[in-house]
Amino acid sequence: MEWSDEGIILGVRRHGEAGAIVELLTRGHGRHLGLVRGGASSRLRPLLQPGNSVLAVWRARLDEHLGYYQLEGTRMRAATMLASSHAVYGITHLASLARLLPERDPHEDIYEMLERTLDDFDDVGDAATHLIRFELAMLAELGFGLDLSACAATGATTDLIYVSPKSGGAVSRTAGEPWREKLLRLPDFLREDNDGRNGWSDQDLRDGFDLTGRFLLRNVLEPRGQGHSDARDGFINAVAKHLARAAIV
């Protein structure tokens, strides 16, 4: 058995004295593990870092075997990402989200979104909005997508500023006003009628993480006996600290 594919490194763990088991999210073969001979060596250490993109060749005698990877770096992001705390927490959290997908099950849209998210991780605000969008995409991919296109109560497609914590549907300002204390806020940058000119605010980011966090916890994590990763909390705190420092300056 042999195939080649694009992949993003999610995690690496040592195997034996010199090898390493590398976990990739690949474009066409999903989340897939393989053994890299000599993967624990100093020569391969810069390559085998979470967040790096690679061209992977996988070989095994049978399809169900772990198999062996031969990897070639195509986008080496890790060195830059390791220099900022938000990026370190971010890639760790993104990897934990990707692990919610079944192994060896292709999810090309998620792969492409992860690629774009990592490419924009230099800017803290962009990283946060991309990560919130990635969490929304994961909810949809796992069968729990939110309908933010129209008001769940009236069908209106404009002035959507709330989300129902029960249905996951958007709610307009007028329809939601009587119950605003019980509704979740829909960040401006997630509104479909936002053409991008309005940007985002610190409150938008808090609302966004609250929104995706609640549905991930209730619909995906708690049924699996899990909670939010420490890396998610670390990312949110790192973003908040960075924005607070920027506001002072």
UniProtKB/Swiss-Prot annotation:
GO terms for biological process: DNA recombination; double-strand break repair. InterPro entries: ARFGAP/RecO (IPR037278), DNA_rep/recomb_RecO_N (IPR022572), NA-bd_OB-fold (IPR012340), RecO (IPR003717), RecO_C (IPR042242). It comes from the Bacteria. The keyword Transport does not apply. Keywords: DNA damage, DNA recombination, DNA repair. Signal peptide: none annotated. One of its GO terms (cellular component) is bacterial nucleoid. The keyword DNA repair applies. It holds the Pfam family RecO_C. Belongs to the RecO family. Involved in DNA repair and RecF pathway recombination. PANTHER family: DNA REPAIR PROTEIN RECO. This is DNA repair protein RecO.
